[in-house]
Amino acid sequence: MREILHIQGGQCGNQIGAKFWEVICGEHGVDSTGCYSGVSPQQLERINVYYNEAGGGRYVPRAVLMDLEPGTMESIRAGPFGGIFRPDNFVYGQSGAGNNWAKGHYTEGAELIDSVLDVVRKEAENCDCLQGFQVCHSLGGGTGSGMGTLLISKIREEYPDRMMLTFSVFPSPKVSDTVVEPYNATLSVHQLVENADECMVLDNEALYDICFRTLKLTNPSFGDLNHLISATMSGVTCCLRFPGQLNSDLRKLAVNLIPFPRLHFFMVGFAPLTSRGSQQYRALTVPELTQQMWDAKNMMCAADPRHGRYLTASAMFRGKMSTKEVDEQMINVQNKNSSYFVEWIPNNVKSSVCDIPPVGLSMSSTFVGNSTSIQEMFRRVSEQFTAMFRRKAFLHWYTSEGMDEMEFTEAESNMNDLVAEYQQYQDATAEEYDEEEQDGEEEHD
């Protein structure tokens, strides 16, 4: 079966990852000891996408957990699902990366990376037909961003033809955790542009807004934010894990969503939004799901899709519903909001339907969109980067770990190029596109 190997790095990545496994275990009927206690044979049919079957009928997550300090790992081990992971798959150092990308990428992280790769190799060898990797990390800190991108580039070398999907938590515009976030994020994006296939962009502030505005939580905790992220992560991969009428996998998703190889940063959304522990009290309809899913307030990153245009988008519906109704709704959205879709990619919205809804809901939908408005996030980080880099503020923390200023300059210009590319396709029209092609043909004569 098409297995996915899950890797989580750094504090943020490990906390999101731990939540994700709780959600997946719930969907597949696996309890906290790894024993199956589910009700439907469909839960087991493709359970090996995310689990290895060990002796005694236990299911063990295909997960690699890494960090440069033991803290988060220990709290996962002590948590509700701590006993389910393979003990050898916890790989951690003692020193920490101190929010320093260079430590994660070049010094501390580089010392630990081989032991992580050994575990990854062992897990990959256990797979029948490995489909790809999913990495959870944040881009603002040191470990998830520095060591995370180091691992991604090493995996890229070793498994060049496997899909690399990342769930990357961007620094938020208003909620800043550390002052050097813009440096760490820019250096990471520089790597992700080259080495990842698909990046799902998340950001804490947008998640806070959703908790606050939509879920009416007065002071949301990281647990609440991670609950939203894990719902989306589960939605993106449900087609691989359960039977459905219109299935898709990571590669199909990429083929449908990425018109140009560098533009692989996606906005994600989820519907229906419910807070932890509250059940849905009324049945949903496909039109309601569609409406909520496309709503700008529903996006999990701080960019407004109304400020740009969608190059492509994909919607994954879950639950018992009519495929015809789904298709009608999607066409309806495109017709009503045609100005928000580029006209030079016809039929640029793909939908898939999976029969099994998430636990506690009758139906749900996950949205993944490739919108040019995501440049707002890159632009914002880039401006903060430039403001500090111009004065060479905090640079000594990086140069003392052996980094060169040149690398910063390259990362900065790569980020600016990315913003310019998004802008270029946002402004492009179908007529222009035809003219360019004609010019090209004339040159070849």
UniProtKB/Swiss-Prot annotation:
Tubulin is the major constituent of microtubules, a cylinder consisting of laterally associated linear protofilaments composed of alpha- and beta-tubulin heterodimers. Microtubules grow by the addition of GTP-tubulin dimers to the microtubule end, where a stabilizing cap forms. Below the cap, tubulin dimers are in GDP-bound state, owing to GTPase activity of alpha-tubulin. GTP binds at residues 11, 69, 138, 142-144, 204, 226. Residues 425-445 are annotated as: Disordered. Residues 429-445 have a biased composition (Acidic residues). Keywords: Cytoplasm, Cytoskeleton, GTP-binding, Magnesium, Metal-binding, Microtubule, Nucleotide-binding. Dimer of alpha and beta chains. A typical microtubule is a hollow water-filled tube with an outer diameter of 25 nm and an inner diameter of 15 nM. Alpha-beta heterodimers associate head-to-tail to form protofilaments running lengthwise along the microtubule wall with the beta-tubulin subunit facing the microtubule plus end conferring a structural polarity. Microtubules usually have 13 protofilaments but different protofilament numbers can be found in some organisms and specialized cells. GO terms for biological process: microtubule cytoskeleton organization; mitotic cell cycle. GO terms for molecular function: GTP binding; GTPase activity; metal ion binding; structural constituent of cytoskeleton. CDD domains: beta_tubulin. Its main location: cytoplasm. It is found in: Cytoplasm, Cytoskeleton. Mg(2+) binds at residue 69. The keyword Nucleotide-binding applies. Its cofactor is Mg(2+). This is Tubulin beta-3 chain. InterPro entries: Beta-tubulin_BS (IPR013838), Beta_tubulin (IPR002453), Tub_FtsZ_C (IPR008280), Tubulin (IPR000217), Tubulin/FtsZ-like_C (IPR037103), Tubulin/FtsZ_2-layer-sand-dom (IPR018316), Tubulin/FtsZ_GTPase_sf (IPR036525), Tubulin_C (IPR023123). The keyword Nucleotide-binding applies. GO terms for cellular component: cytoplasm; microtubule. It comes from the Eukaryota. It holds the Pfam family Tubulin_C. The lineage of its organism: Eukaryota, Viridiplantae, Streptophyta, Embryophyta, Tracheophyta.
